[in-house]
Structure formats: C-alpha cells, structure tokens
Amino acid sequence: MFGALKKAFKAGAKEVQADYSHNKDYLEAVCAAAALVANADGEIEDSERSKVERVLSSHPVLSKMYQQNIIAQTAETMFKRAKDASGRQALARELDDIKGRDDGKMAEDVYLIALDVANADGELEPQEDAVLKKIAARLGVDPTRFEF
C-alpha cells in the first residue's frame, strides 16, 4: 500500500514540476499581452508602464509565483518589443506559447490580466478594446465569457 502511495506522490511531483516548467512562458505571455494593451494607441507612456506594473505586482497569482524584479524585467523586455511591427508580432507569438495549455485556463488568465490592465484607469479605450479582441482571438478565448 505504501509503495503505491509513494508512486502516486512521485507522479504528482512530476506533474507539478511539469506545470512549473511552463511558468516562464506564462509570465512572458502575461507581460506580452499587457505590453500590447499598453501600446494600443501606438506609444507606451510612463503612466501606462506604471499601470501595468501596478496590475501585475498586485495580481494574487503572479505575485506569489514570481519575484517582483522578475515581473518588472519581463514587462520591460515586452515594452521594448512593442515599439515596432516585428516586435509586436514577437509579442503575439508569446501568446501562442500558452495557447491550449491547462485546457485553456492559462490563456483565459492571460486575457483576464490584459483586461485588468486595460481597465486599470477606469476607462476602456476603443483602441484597447480592439487589441483585447485580437489577444482573445490569438489565445482562442471567447471574451463574451468574461462580461461580468
């Protein structure tokens, strides 16, 4: 009996390790989506950087999974990529990296964090809404499921 229990624990530990091996992709996808939303009007202002930093650092899951400096570094990398078309396409590819993982839950979480970033100032701009729709399409997420 204990041998079977030991095997079950080992198998569970391997699953947890497999889940954590994707964490870098998750953080990169979150920061890519946030950068795309922040750049919706074609430029990322200091206030938008602060808004993204505030949303990401206070997010209950992200703040437990990643150190603040890692979140900030990753976000800054994604902000730099958002400056031109090839960089924005690279950001879109970051979204592809998590599409379909965890039965789509990871993609939904990325979309919801992008929505939080867009709504952080209390106003969803038309450009931000358009980018959110593109993010949802890229992730294979139905945004109408989150209209609460």
Which residues make up each language-model segment?
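Small-residue-enriched hydrophobic alpha-helices in membranes
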Residues: M1-L36, E43-F148
